[in-house]
Design a protein with these regions (language model features):
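Conserved ABC ATPase "signature" region
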Residues: 12-29
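Conserved ABC ATPase signature
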Residues: 33-37, 41
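Hydrophobic anchor residue at the start of the ABC signature
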Residues: 47
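Catalytic Walker B motif of ABC-type/P-loop ATPase nucleotide-binding domains
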Residues: 58-61
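H-loop/switch region of ABC-family ATPase nucleotide-binding domains
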Residues: 93-94
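Conserved beta-strand-loop-alpha-helix hinge in the C-terminal portion
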Residues: 113-137
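ABC ATPase nucleotide-binding domains
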Residues: 130-162
Length: 162
């Protein structure tokens, strides 16, 4: 009976490992030495290692650093699934576009203190300096558009109204 428990647990662990490998798309990296991985591949491998622990809270420092646009979308999908499972994700990032597109709440630290904390939308709309390129370019016409997607939607809506 005791060995049956271990066999079942081993199968569960293997299944979880396969799921994490697939989610983080690191299957082709498993036989490589960590020093041979690119920065983005190292980020994905590190995320996979952490996800195997099934954390309730994820503390991430610059998780998009070194990632291409395709994998940033994949990372956002992973974060969304984790949030649905009740995982809290706290990340520090200078990737304004990623934070604007996928963040729930954004805060700014200055001199060791949080000086503001708002919904991602309110944070980037109300900020002249720390905002997205899309918001800077379109704010005169569409002040509430923060992401490229929102600017495109606002343009399309405006065009239909003409």
């Amino acid at each position: 009976m005791f060995s049956g428990f271990h066999i079942q647990r081993k199968k569960e662990c293997e299944k979880q490992m396969e799921r994490v490998i697939e989610d983080t798309q690191i299957g082709h990296l498993l036989d490589m030495h960590p020093y041979d991985l690119s920065g983005g591949e190292q980020q994905r491998a590190a995320l996979a290692k952490v996800l195997l622990l099934e954390p309730e809270i994820l503390l991430l420092d610059e998780p998009t650093k070194g990632l291409d646009g395709f994998y940033k979308q994949k990372l956002a999908d992973i974060f969304e699934r984790l949030k649905k499972r009740g995982v809290t994700i706290l990340m520090v990032s200078h990737d304004i576009e990623f934070c604007a597109s996928y963040g729930d709440t954004c805060a700014m630290f200055f001199d060791g203190s949080v000086i503001t904390s708002q919904s991602a939308k309110a944070f980037f709309v109300g900020n002249s300096f720390y905002t997205t390129a899309a918001n800077r370019m379109a704010r005169q016409l569409y002040p509430d558009a923060v992401t490229v997607k929102e600017v495109i939607e606002a343009c399309s809506k405006n065009r239909r109204q003409e």
